[in-house]
Amino acid sequence: MKQPVPSAHFDGFPREFTDFLFSLRFRNTIDLLPENKIKYKALITEPLTLLSNDLTQTALSISDTLNVKPSKCVSTMYSDMRFSRATPLKEYMYIRFREPSCEHDILGLYFDMGCEGYSYGIRIYNQTSAGMESIREGVLAKRRDFTRELEKLSSHGIMIVGDKYARDHYPDITDNNSIKVLLNMRSFHMCWDKAIDETVFNRALLDEITCAYRGLNNIFLLLKQALLQN
């Protein structure tokens, strides 16, 4: 009796991927595209798709409306030829679990990686000033909830990164730095940034991102609720 073939799971990126991505800085040409495509598929596209598949249930446990189709979530190997005609392949990779399509302020979980480092967390795609104002209103309306989650995440090393106002727009808030930082952002994302290390070459990367996504559950839902008012 023929045994069923077990489904594949993510077990790390091949060690060669860093050297390959670095080499694309110098060898990413149309002439070398046939050779590079074969390597790209094996070293990046295939393991990245497995990683996305293995993160899917965690993403859906945070928000069951996230788009988790690999064709929508996993970066393709090809650069946008409108802007990168001479360099046909991407020199980085990403996974995007985003809320259903709309024109702006699209909340999502992400993972990015290049040859030197990787990052994961929460992004808001096509962020607008109106969307940011909705978030500020949500923060102020649920100040205690946001404070609890931001302080918890800060203790675990998350960063709020983005474009800040030149001056403090909330000088009256003197007892809550985590809230003040978020309120004074024009745009932002929440992330953990890591250097490439042994983690990316085995299943530990999946475990690390899974744990981080679960820790983002409450802040993700708070941001989602705030943006629904936009």
List PLM regions with ranges:
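Aromatic- and glycine-enriched beta-alpha-beta binding-site module
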Residues: 80-141
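Soluble extramembrane domains of integral membrane proteins
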Residues: 70-73, 79-82, 86-96, 106, ...
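Short histidine-centered catalytic/ligand-binding loop motif
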Residues: 37-44, 124, 134-139, 201, ...
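Long, solvent-exposed, polar/charged low-complexity segments
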Residues: 1-30, 49-52, 140, 161-230
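Glycine-rich, often proline-containing surface loops adjacent to acidic residues and nearby aromatics
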Residues: 35, 115-120, 184-192
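Compact, glycine/acidic-enriched structural inserts
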Residues: 114-174
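Surface-exposed helix-capping loop/turn segments at secondary-structure junctions
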Residues: 55-66, 154, 222-230
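Active-site acidic/histidine clusters and adjacent loop/turn architecture
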Residues: 22-74
